[in-house]
């Protein structure tokens, strides 16, 4: 037989594919098996082998087509190594690493569970808009440590309870609550700017992030709690709670069995729980002494829900806690990055100041002005695209699904790399900070600073009002001047739950230089 095959190859000089040669030989033998001269089962056996080869070939091609790129399993080393990388580098940094290495759809493992890291716009949008991804993932023991396991709204994966508490958040963050926001933001920002001398050191520097956090926590208190509090003390406890949240979110179970390892984190979480409980008790006492109850705020609504048996005391405390912490470590840092970007882009700052003067003139800021501040809104959107504070979202599939042709089993963890998605080629200058990126309307599938769909950020509208108001008040009264070397690109930062600047004096110290004229009805 070889004498027939190889001379033929020699004469034709054509490449011979192994699978084609095997098929030809098998078919020849199968034909021989049907010849009366060959009464044996060889033909049937070879036909069965042929079918098996074909099935294996098709299966292999199917697997290659339907498997998402990522590190190999390698006898369990792949899951272990990827999990260690997420713990060591932080969730955000590790996700960027895997997307950079394997592409915009990557399969990794966290705590032994298959996890997808998605930055492809169409895939991210698919997950955001479908209700089967309303659950989040994280260590059960870690979430219990910080009070978020099946409580509150941020990481509550009890979908039924999450929907119930979301209605209270939605009521507080829209409607009359949204209408009051602008007035309170203006008043709080101006009050803190009037007292700027108390935060200024001997060299004339101000810790700008501390200032912004004080403004934001004061706004949150006035809107949602409205009780006397010590801003600095509460901010210290919020910061420790946030550090704990980042630390325990994906830690393995054995971490929580080693008491000496996580005692400080558990104590930090408990400190904030106790502080929030004290504030709620203050509000409860006020309600008991009030003669008339009108226009109930967020905390008051929750207290009444608890009294009617709709919510537990623990859930009320966690909801108030999450409402209070949401802005200081997201919105305040977003505004901090925006102030840095303005100093790196002086022409953009000039355009914003001109617009403020044109739209407001000598009048006080009103809701009707906000829709006319097109340059300011464009700047905020570009800042959120170029350097988002929260650039990842965490989901878990509640049902089997198919994303971009790939099968996603129920229970799969999903990390949505929104920050990387925002650098897609849809934008004219995806790698640069430029208002040109928003010269035309951007479809929602390419721009998701607050998410979309059933689990989108419930406070996205109020956040835009707060950012516009705080920026406008600060810029109209002061020129904010950081150190020359302090830019968004070169300041040290971490990226775990969110992008956080490393808080050292050099990074956060800026000068507030009063403007000679400003666009408010206020004397210079």
UniProtKB/Swiss-Prot annotation:
Gene Ontology BP annotations: female gonad development; lipid metabolic process; response to estradiol
Cellular localisation: Membrane
PROSITE patterns linked to this entry: CYTOCHROME_P450
GO annotation, cellular component aspect: endoplasmic reticulum; membrane
Alphabetical list of Pfam families matching this protein: p450 (PF00067)
Membrane topology note: Peripheral membrane protein
Binding site for heme: 457
Predominant localisation class: membrane
Function statement: Catalyzes the formation of aromatic C18 estrogens from C19 androgens.
Family: Belongs to the cytochrome P450 family.
Protein known as: Aromatase
Organism: Ictalurus punctatus
């Amino acid at each position: 037989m070889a004498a027939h095959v190889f001379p033929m190859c020699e004469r034709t000089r054509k490449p011979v594919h192994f699978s084609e040669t095997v098929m030809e030989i098998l078919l020849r033998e199968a034909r021989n098996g049907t010849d009366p001269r060959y009464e044996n089962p060889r033909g049937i056996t070879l036909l069965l082998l042929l079918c098996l080869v074909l099935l294996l070939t098709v299966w292999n091609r199917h697997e290659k087509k339907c498997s998402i790129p990522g590190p190999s399993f390698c006898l369990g080393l792949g899951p272990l190594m990827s999990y260690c990388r997420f713990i060591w580098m932080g969730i955000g940094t590790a996700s960027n690493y895997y997307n950079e290495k394997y592409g915009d759809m990557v399969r990794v493992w966290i705590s032994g569970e298959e996890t997808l890291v998605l930055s492809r716009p169409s895939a991210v949008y698919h997950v955001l808009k479908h209700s089967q991804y309303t659950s989040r993932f994280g260590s059960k023991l870690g979430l219990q440590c910080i009070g978020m396991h099946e409580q509150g709204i941020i990481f509550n994966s009890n979908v039924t309870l999450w929907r119930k508490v979301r209605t209270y958040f939605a009521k507080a963050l829209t409607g009359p609550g949204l209408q009051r926001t602008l007035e309170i933001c203006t008043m709080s920002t101006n009050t803190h700017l009037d007292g700027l001398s108390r935060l200024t050191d001997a060299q004339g520097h101000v810790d700008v992030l501390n200032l912004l956090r004080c403004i934001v926590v004061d706004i949150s208190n006035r809107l949602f709690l409205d009780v006397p509090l010590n801003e600095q003390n509460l901010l210290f406890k919020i910061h420790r709670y946030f550090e704990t949240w980042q630390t325990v979110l994906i830690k393995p179970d054995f971490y929580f069995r080693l008491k000496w390892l996580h005692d400080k984190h558990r104590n930090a979480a408990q400190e904030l729980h106790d502080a929030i409980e004290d504030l709620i008790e203050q509000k409860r006492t006020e309600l008991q002494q009030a003669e008339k109850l009108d226009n109930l705020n967020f905390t008051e609504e929750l207290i009444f829900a608890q009294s009617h048996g709709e919510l537990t005391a623990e859930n009320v405390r966690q909801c108030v806690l999450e409402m209070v912490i949401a802005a200081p470590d997201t919105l305040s840092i977003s505004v901090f990055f925006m102030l840095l970007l303005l100093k790196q882009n002086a022409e953009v700052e000039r355009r914003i100041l001109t617009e403020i003067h044109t739209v407001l003139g000598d009048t006080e800021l009103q809701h009707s002005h906000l829709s006319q501040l097109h340059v300011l809104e464009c700047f905020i959107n570009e800042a959120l695209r170029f350097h988002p504070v929260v650039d990842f979202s965490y989901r878990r599939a509640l049902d089997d699904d198919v994303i971009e042709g790939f099968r996603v089993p129920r229970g799969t963890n999903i990390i949505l790399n929104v920050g990387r998605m925002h650098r897609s080629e849809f934008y004219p200058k995806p790698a640069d900070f430029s208002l040109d990126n928003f010269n035309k309307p951007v479809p929602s599938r390419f721009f998701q600073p607050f998410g979309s769909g059933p689990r989108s950020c419930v406070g996205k509208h109020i956040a835009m009002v707060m950012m516009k108001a705080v920026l406008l008040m600060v810029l109209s009264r002061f020129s904010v001047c950081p150190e020359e070397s302090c830019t968004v690109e070169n300041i040290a930062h971490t990226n775990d739950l969110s992008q956080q600047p490393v808080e050292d004096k050099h990074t956060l110290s800026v000068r507030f230089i009063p403007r000679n004229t400003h666009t408010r009805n206020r004397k210079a």
